[in-house]
Amino acid sequence: MAPCHIRKYQESDRQWVVGLLSRGMAEHAPATFRQLLKLPRTLILLLGGPLALLLVSGSWLLALVFSISLFPALWFLAKKPWTEYVDMTLCTDMSDITKSYLSERGSCFWVAESEEKVVGMVGALPVDDPTLREKRLQLFHLFVDSEHRRQGIAKALVRTVLQFARDQGYSEVILDTGTIQLSAMALYQSMGFKKTGQSFFCVWARLVALHTVHFIYHLPSSKVGSL
């Protein structure tokens, strides 16, 4: 296993980072597709649609063509929330990472580098909400290249964010992840994050029953030990 070190993002990392984001989102489409196929409304469509068409038209061929054509449409639906997220992100905070994450104190973006390749990343931005009683940091875009997983890189990146939050005087760290991202949820919970709720991040996610789970990590000011 090649050594890996975590450092701040540089502009020369952009191509690597965008690639990680795109690949990381795309790899969730198959699991989303399998989940979509199990939904009651999908089963009704897959079974009832062709049957209804057969009864109306009397054509087995037409019913078969309709049934087969449903699968590309469902695959499109499974991919859409993830492509939508990538497009949205590349138009907002990831459009200029240096400006969004490194131009002001209290925010940062890190990459994990191994053998001169960026194999992981994570960002952190302050939560701008005047109604909050506590100073809160939000973790964004935790990704590790598929070939470098199970090496502790994701945990090291999360620890980097938590330590940064301590150093900057934050009281809480929050993040969002999908219900379909089981390994990510297990990681966060093993590190002390607690669920606070769930929602849908876009209409496409609602269509495929893809919930976003919200987590929080409390950093009491009196706690000075290691993570």
UniProtKB/Swiss-Prot annotation:
Q: Give the record's membrane topology.
A: Single-pass type II membrane protein
Ranges per topology, Cytoplasmic? 1-42
Domain of life of the source: Eukaryota
Known outcome of mutating residue 149 to K: Loss of the cysteine S-conjugate N-acetyltransferase activity. No effect on protein expression
The residues covered by the N-acetyltransferase domain are 61-220
Look up the record and give one Gene Ontology term from the biological process aspect: positive regulation of gene expression
Q: Does the keyword Transferase apply?
A: yes
Write down what this protein is called: N-acetyltransferase 8
Q: What gene name is listed for this protein?
A: NAT8
